[in-house]
A protein has these predicted regions:
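Charge-biased low-complexity segments
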Residues: 4-141
């Protein structure tokens, strides 16, 4: 049995060195580009990430023999080229095999298809962005 749930807390807004304005564009994926509202598009991107991680963790041979039930916070970076990678994974409890889960999540995000990076519209440039992705992982043998 495997489950991956979204925590009630909404992910934090993007954090970057430049001041973010309402007209700037958050990172997204092709599946979300037709969503007009900025917040809805960002939520579509988060849902894409949740589904990507959930489906790939569920189908990973590496998790088949693990027991894991914890809340985690993945600090994700999307660079200006659209590469996605975690800068840090924080586990609420350390009683589980967090090193193995940590390794699996790093591999999954490193192998994730490129996304559309954030755009600083007043400068017309693609920028690196960072945000927190909270998850509850419940893996049972």
């Amino acid at each position: 049995f495997f489950s991956c749930d979204v925590l009630e807390k909404k992910p934090n807004e993007m954090s970057e060195e430049l001041i973010w304005t309402a007209n700037d564009e958050y990172p997204t994926v092709i599946e979300c580009e037709n969503v007009v509202d900025t917040k809805d598009r960002l939520n579509c991107f988060y849902e894409y990430l949740y589904e990507y991680l959930s489906n790939n963790l569920k189908n990973s041979h590496d998790v088949k023999n693990l027991e894991f039930n914890d809340s985690i916070m993945i600090k994700i970076i999307v660079d200006k080229n659209g590469n996605v990678y975690p800068s840090e994974i924080i586990f609420k409890n350390l009683e589980y095999n967090s090193e193995k889960i940590n390794s699996i999540i790093y591999e999954l995000l490193d192998s994730m298809p490129k996304v559309v990076p954030a755009v600083k519209t007043d400068y017309g440039v693609k920028v690196k962005s960072q945000f927190d992705l909270p998850l509850i992982l419940n893996i049972k043998k």
